[in-house]
Structure formats: structure tokens, C-alpha cells
Amino acid sequence: MFIALWEFFYGHFFRFWMKWLLRQMTGKCELQRIFDTYVGAQRTHRIENSLTYSKNKVLQKATLVVQSEVDRCVEDIMKEKNINPEKDASFKICMKACLLQISGYKQLYLDVESVRKKPYDSDNLQHEKLLIKLWNLLMPTKKLKARISKQWADIGFQGDDPKTDFRGMGILGLINLVYFSENYTSEAHQILSRSNHPKLGYSYAIVGINLTEMAYSLLKSEALKFHLYNFVPGIPTMEHFHQFYCYLVYEFDKFWFEEKPESIMYFNVYREKFHEKIKGLLLDCNVSLTLKI
């Protein structure tokens, strides 16, 4: 109740007068003051909030701009706020960078969601090739005897046909598994080997798909904003999402063996504990979670 009242009071009264007072004192609008004071994710986050809570329709709409309209949007903002480019030459550059990050994050979510919604299709030759590629990357010295085979359990699938394990995350789960195995082959082999530990073992592929869901949910909830705003100076792409996934895979394996669960039956408990740890790290405005080998 108190928080709701404070937000109402701040948004409708206090914020307006504070902005007015600061403009009189500094001769600069709130957006300019943010650029003068902050860098990295803090800057983009504060710009996004300033635009979102502005009563000015031009500024409000800026958070919804598509990438192709960013340049024109920046010009509209400068006109609306009476910013002279000759007196503040950096404003245009800084605002464009922020809007590209803001619009890029929204577009990245749409791109990831689009891939996630595509189910694995065994009649799709590209899907089948990708699945076989995963096997060859993880088991280079062992030939897959048949497409439907108990051998899939060797890399952590549950049944004889892996397509059933991709239902939740669609083709996105497979793409992530292949990306990690292709770009961090040595680490993938090491983690696959560790996943066969007699006591602390887990299903490598199933856990990998589970971590795709974690990465996706963090992106959807906007928890990845600080990370991506710091990690990517321009427009975040699927490549950056895959990189974050790789970080999760590597760090989860370390976490699992450090925690030493009594059995795989406690997977959900430790998975959630790991999830909370990552969410905590992502609250830091200076965060940049990159895989460091």
C-alpha cells in the first residue's frame, strides 16, 4: 500500500518538480544529465525509465521504436527537448546508442521466442542434420548406429528419439546444445564426461535443454537487461543469447559438483538454487556474465 502511494506521488508530483528544479539549476534536461553522469547499463536503464515515465508522448513512444526508425526518433527527441546539437554534440550519439540497445533487447526476445515456438520436426532435413551434428560433436569417435537408438542416452537424452525431449523449448534447445558443443568443444566434452559421474551424474542433454528454458525465462522477464546493456554496446543478437546460455551450462556444472547433491532426485531443488544465484548476479547494474575459460 505504502509503495503504491509513493509511486503515485512520485510519478505525479515529486518527479515533475524535481526535474524542473534540476533543469533550472543545470540548464539541462533529465536525459542530458543522465548522459553526463552515468555509463553502461546504468545509463541505458535510466534513459529507458526516463522515457517510459515521461508525460511527453514523443518520449514515451521512443521506448517502442523499431531499429529502422531510431535515427528519426532521436531527431524528434532533440526537437522536443530543444537540444542544440552544436552545444551538445554527444547527445545524438548517446541517445542513438541507448535506443538501439532498448529496441534491440525487445527484438531479441521476439527472435528467441520465434525460434522457441518452432517444434523439432523429424521430417525437416535441417533439424535432422542439426541433431546428427550434435552427436558427432559430442561423440566424434563413436558412430551413431541408427537415428532411433538407445545410444542417445550416452549424451543425456531420455528416450530412443531425442525429438520428444525438445517439446518445451522447441528447436531452440537443440540450437543451444549445438552452439555450446561447436564453440566450446573441449568444455562440452569435459562436462559430458563429468555428467556420467557414478554419484553426481546428470542427463547432459536434458539439463542443457532445461538451461535453455532458464536463459529464455530470464530474457523474457527482462532480467538480462543489465547484462546485455553492459555486454553489448550496440544491438544484442541471438549470438549474445547463445553466449549467455554457454555461461549457464558451464557455471551450472561447476555449481552442481560444488554442491554435491545426494542424488539426481534433488535436481529441481538445486536447479532453483542456481537460478536464484544467477538472478541475484543479474541485479548488479555493472554485471556482465561471460564465460571465462
Swiss-Prot record:
Keywords: GTPase activation. One of its GO terms (molecular function) is GTPase activator activity. Transmembrane segments: none annotated. The keyword ATP-binding does not apply. GO terms for biological process: regulation of defense response to virus. GO terms for cellular component: protein-containing complex. It holds the Pfam family ELMO_CED12. Residues 126-282 form the ELMO domain. Acts as a GTPase-activating protein (GAP) toward guanine nucleotide exchange factors like ARL2, ARL3, ARF1 and ARF6, but not for GTPases outside the Arf family. This is ELMO domain-containing protein 2.
